[in-house]
Every structure is written in structure tokens, then in C-alpha cells.
Regions:
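Loop-to-transmembrane helix entry
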Residues: 1-17, 42-44, 136-143
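Loop-to-transmembrane helix entry/capping segments in MFS-fold secondary transporters
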Residues: 3-5, 95-105
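Glycine-rich segments within core transmembrane alpha-helices of 12-TM secondary carriers
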Residues: 14-22, 106-118
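Helix-to-loop junctions at the C-terminal end of transmembrane segments
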Residues: 21-37, 125-126
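Paired intracellular helix-loop junctions of major facilitator superfamily
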Residues: 33-35, 89-98
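C-terminal transmembrane helical hairpin of 12-TM major facilitator-type secondary transporters
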Residues: 37-85
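A membrane-interface helix-boundary motif in multi-pass transporters
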Residues: 39-42, 123-147
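Multi-pass alpha-helical transporter architecture, strongest
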Residues: 52-61, 142-172
């Protein structure tokens, strides 16, 4: 498959499954939170736990077709933590604090996820390529950042373990 076709399909398979993951995880989180106050965190934790093996499979895919399939799954699961995380953050603050909570959360997500993450993958890929790994440098760079997903999962699981009641004023 030519590079321009792979790029086209990677773009499509990032946007559509990512948006679907955000939307469906929001629906699942809304349903689960009626059964348990931790329902939103369960969805975020579950999506991250499921994401890790698919990220590994994506990085190690031996064919463009498999890589594209894994890309779709990783973008679906990679977006699935977002809606429950934002909803959870809003449930932990008063209505007057929601804009600030959103600003802090989105600043962190964008600085790390959209700023540092891609830059780090690029730097690691360039370094691996310069060390003689050739085109496999990107594969190793993608694998090298997977431990950050374990950190995120551990933090979500820790948040699940906290038994703090919601703020009384956070109810609408």
C-alpha cells in the first residue's frame, strides 16, 4: 500500500473511531454513574486497560492492514477516557468551579497528550533511526511511551479507590 494511502486511512481511522469512542464512553459513563458514583472512573479505567494491549499490537503490526485495524481500535479506546474524565472532574467541583476545572484538565491533557507526547515519539523515533534501527525506529518509539499508559491507568485505579463523597453543591 503506498504511503499516501496509508496516511489517508490513518487519518480516517483516527477521527471516526476516536469520536465514536468519546461519544459511546459518555453514554456508558452516564449509565454506570446511576448505579455507582464511580461509574465514570470505571469507564475511563476500563478503556485504558483495554487500550494497552492494542497499542502494543499496533506498534508491532506486521502488515499495513493489521496496523490500520489496530489504529482504529486504539483511537476508539484512546478517546474513550475523555468524556468520563471531564464529567468526573465536573462532578467533583461546584458549578462555579467547572470552567476552572475544565481549563486545568484540558491544559494538562493538551500539554502532555498533544504537546509532549508526539514530540517525544518523534525524538525517540529519530534517535532510534540514527542508532541503526531504520524504519523500525517509529515502532520502538511507540512502544517506549506505553509505560505512560500504565501510569495513567494506575492513577485512574487510585482515584477509583478513594472513598470521598461527592460535593453536595455539585448536584444540578
Amino acid at each position: 500500500m503506498p504511503l499516501h494511502e496509508i496516511a489517508f486511512w490513518l487519518a480516517i481511522l483516527a477521527v471516526l473511531p476516536g469520536a465514536l469512542g468519546i461519544w459511546l464512553s459518555g453514554i456508558a459513563a452516564d449509565w454506570l454513574v446511576r448505579r455507582s458514583p464511580k461509574g465514570r472512573l470505571w469507564v475511563a479505567s476500563g478503556s485504558l486497560a483495554l487500550l494497552i494491549p492494542f497499542e502494543i499490537a499496533y506498534a508491532l503490526a506486521g502488515s499495513p492492514g493489521l496496523a490500520l485495524a489496530m489504529s482504529a481500535i486504539t483511537h476508539f479506546l484512546g478517546g474513550a477516557y475523555l468524556a468520563p474524565t471531564i464529567a468526573f472532574a465536573h462532578s467533583q467541583v461546584t458549578p462555579r468551579q467547572r470552567a476552572s476545572a475544565s481549563a486545568v484538565l484540558l491544559l494538562g491533557l493538551n500539554l502532555i497528550g498533544l504537546g509532549i507526547g508526539p514530540m517525544l515519539v518523534g525524538l525517540l523515533s529519530d534517535a532510534a533511526t540514527a542508532q541503526g534501527f531504520g524504519t523500525a525506529g517509529l515502532r520502538y518509539a511507540l512502544l517506549a511511551i506505553i509505560p505512560s499508559q500504565f501510569v495513567a491507568l494506575a492513577l485512574f485505579l487510585r482515584a477509583n479507590a478513594i472513598d470521598a463523597p461527592p460535593l453536595p453543591s455539585s448536584k444540578e
